[in-house]
Amino acid sequence: PAVGGIAKGQIVREIDALGGQMGLVTDETAIQFRILNRSKGPAMWSPRAQCDRAKFIWSWREKLENTPNLHIWQDTVCELLVENGEVVGLVTLWGVTFKAKCIVLTAGTFLNGLMHVGRHQLPGGRMAEPASYQLTESIARHGIAYGRMKTGTPVRIDARSIHFDLMDTQDGECDFHKFSFMNTSTRHLKQLQCWTCYTNEEVHRILREGLPDSPLFNGQIQSIGPRYCPSIETKIVTFPDKEQHQLFLEPEGETTQELYLNGFSSSLPMDIQIAALKKVPAFKDIVIYRPGYAIEYDYFDPTQLKHSLESKIIKNLFFAGQVNGTTGYEEAGGQGLIAGINAHINCHGGEAFTLARDEAYIGVLIDDLVTKGVDEPYRMFTSRAEYRILLRMDDADMRLTERAYHLGLAREDRYQLMKTKKEALEQIVNFAKNYSMKPALINDALEKLGTTPLRQGCKLIEILNRPQITIENIAEHVPAFQRELEKATAADSDRKEEILEAAEILIKYQGYIDRERMIAEKLARLESIKIKGKFDYASIQSLSTEARQKLVKIDPETIAQASRIPGVSPSDINVLLVLSGR
C-alpha cells in the first residue's frame, strides 16, 4: 500500500508525533520513499512511501499482538447494545456479547459493502472478504442518519507481462527523510523503482465503448465517489478533450510479481479493462491478477459527532475512518487515534482531547467533518488548511508531542527527543540572530554562492534569509557557525540533517510563521466563546432561514465553529455575538 502523499503525509507525521505507530510501520516496510512538492515551499512538502504489502500487514500484526492490555477477538459485530441513550456493549454474529463502557466503530468499507465489475455485483467489504450486515440498521434505529458512498481500486498486474523498456522509471529518494521522528526508526528495505506511462486515444475509445456496461454510468451505482481520485471512465467523460492520462505502476512488495496500476481505478467489465490496457504499448501483452472494481458502502453523517468523535446521539459511541465519509489510511488513522484517546478519557475521566485547525491537519480534518459534513468521500489536501505554514511536516513533533506526553500517550524517550531537537533549533537560530558578519570576511564566499556581496556588516540571519544561501553552504565559510552547528546537534547526531532542515525553515519563513500565528491567535478569541446549548436557534428571527436550519443541525460548540458552517454569514455571526453579550 501507499502511505502519505500531499497533506496525508503530514497527517502520518502528526500521528507519529502523538505516539501512534503508522510512521514506524511505514518506515520499516517502505520500498520506495519520496518527498512530494519539492518545487514548492516547505509548507507544501509531503512524504509518501510505497510499502511492501506483506511486510506492512505483518508489522502491524506484530505491533498489535504485542501491545500490553490489548485483547483481540476475531468476529463480526452485528448489533450495538444501547440503554438510555448510552452504548453499553455489542453482540457478534457468533452470538458473543461484550459489555463495554465505550465503543469505537471503524468499519471501513464493510457496512453493507457491495462490489461491482461491469454488471456483475458481489457482496463484500473488499475482494475476498465478506461484508458486514445488520450493524448499520442497528445503529440507525437509534436515530443516527446514514448514507451510501463509493470508492474504487485499480487492476493488479503480473510484472512478467510488462514491457518495462517502454515506460519511464521513477526512482525513490535515499536521503535522511522518513515518517517517524524516533531516532530508532530506519528505512532499511531496498528502494525499488516505480514506472510511469500514459493512456492514449485508442485506450479512451475502448473505454467509451464500454460505458453502457459501466455501473457508474448505467444507474447501477447511485452513490457518490471521490472527486479527487476519479475512476478512469470518469476521467474520460469529465475531460473529453484530454488526449492522455498518466498511469503509475507500483510494486506491491520485494518478493511478489504483483503490480498496482495507480490512476486506472475502474469498475468497467473485465474484458473492457484488459482490451483498453493492451492499447498502451508497455501493456500490449498484459496479464492481470484481478480486475479493478468499485465498492459501495454505508457511512454515517459526521455532523452528528462532537470534535472528540463521540456521537451526539449515543453517549460513549465513537466513529472513525471511512464510516465518517473520509478516504484513505491516513485520514482514518488520524481519526482513530483521536477517537481512541477520547474513548479512554470517557472511561477514566478528564477533558476531551481535541486538536484545533492551527495545531494539526487532523484538527482541520475533524473540524471539516463535524462542521461542514460530507456529500462525497473526503480527502485531505494542503489547500483545506488555512494555516499551512504552521502545519508543516518538519515540526509535527514540536506541535503535538508535549500534549501527547502529558496524556501518557507519547513515551519519555519520544518526549526527550522532541526537547533535544527544540533546544538545538533555539541554539542555531539564536546564534544566527546574534553573530555579526563583516563584508571583508564573507564577500568572496557570497560571490561564489551566486549572491550579492555585503556593503556593510549584518547579522548572519540576514544572509541566511537569501534564497541562494543554506545553513550548510554558508557554514563552510563561517567556521564559528560550523562549530556551533556541531555543538547544537551533538546530543542528537543521528538526526543532524533533520534538525538543520528544520532550523533553516524556521529562519527563512519566520516572518510568514509569525504572521500566520497572529491570525490564528485572533481567531482563537472566537474559539473561546462557547455557545453550545445557549440558544434556541429556530426562534431567532434575525438569523437567516438557512443559518437557523444549519445551526439547529450542527449545534456548534463555539462562535468560531459557527462561523465555519456553510450558509452561516458574517451578519449571522454578528447576531450571535450580540446575543452572547459581546
Regions inferred by a protein language model and the residue ranges of each:
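Glycine-/small-residue-rich beta->alpha transition segments that form the dinucleotide
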Residues: 102, 107-111, 268-269, 281
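A glycine-rich dinucleotide-binding beta-alpha-beta segment and adjacent secondary-structure elements
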Residues: 260-326, 354-367, 485, 496-550, ...
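An anion/pyrophosphate-binding glycine-rich loop and adjacent beta-alpha core
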Residues: 8, 137-274, 362, 371-456, ...
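Conserved N-terminal/central alpha/beta ligand/cofactor-binding core
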Residues: 1-79, 94, 106-123, 130-136, ...
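Glycine-rich phosphate/pyrophosphate-binding beta-alpha loops
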Residues: 322-330, 386-388
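Internal hydrophobic alpha-helix adjacent to the cofactor/substrate pocket in enzyme cavities
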Residues: 15, 332-355
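Extended, charge-enriched "interface" segments that sit outside catalytic cores
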Residues: 384, 401-574, 578-582
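Core beta-strand elements of the Rossmann-like FAD/NAD(P) dinucleotide-binding domain
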Residues: 93-102
